[in-house]
């Protein structure tokens, strides 16, 4: 059973209907999951992927939620969970030769990032 003092506060932010496939967003989220807020921002700044811009926006929104709503310090925040789910697909057609048409699928995704305060190392050392 979890005691009330052991429960951690989480701040969550969602980005919905983001243009780009969920699989391409997941490859970036897998690299920043579990990192501190500062380390994640540095990693996102230097990654060569297009999906880093909306991920950065959602991450900053989650940190702003933690700071404003829960009173947490941004320097002590860690990304506890990050996920990307499929959104609706916009279907378009590309005209081709001899009256044919090829379909184009413009994919969207929903990004969810939650942050929580990092566990204090002094408390864990005292328990050992």
From Swiss-Prot:
Matches recorded under InterPro entries: Ribosomal_uL22, Ribosomal_uL22_bac/chlpt-type, Ribosomal_uL22_bac/org-type, Ribosomal_uL22_CS, Ribosomal_uL22_sf
GO process annotations (BP): translation
Entries under SUPFAM superfamilies matching the protein: Ribosomal protein L22
Entry-linked Pfam families: Ribosomal_L22
RNA-binding as UniProt keyword: yes
GO cellular component: cytosolic large ribosomal subunit
Keywords, in A-Z order: Ribonucleoprotein, Ribosomal protein, RNA-binding, rRNA-binding
Gene Ontology MF term list: rRNA binding; structural constituent of ribosome
The keyword NADP appears for this protein: no
PANTHER family: CHLOROPLAST 50S RIBOSOMAL PROTEIN L22-RELATED, LARGE RIBOSOMAL SUBUNIT PROTEIN UL22M
Family per record: Belongs to the universal ribosomal protein uL22 family.
Subunit structure, interactors included: Part of the 50S ribosomal subunit.
UniProt function note: This protein binds specifically to 23S rRNA; its binding is stimulated by other ribosomal proteins, e.g. L4, L17, and L20. It is important during the early stages of 50S assembly. It makes multiple contacts with different domains of the 23S rRNA in the assembled 50S subunit and ribosome. The globular domain of the protein is located near the polypeptide exit tunnel on the outside of the subunit, while an extended beta-hairpin is found that lines the wall of the exit tunnel in the center of the 70S ribosome.
Protein name in UniProt: Large ribosomal subunit protein uL22
This protein's encoding gene: rplV
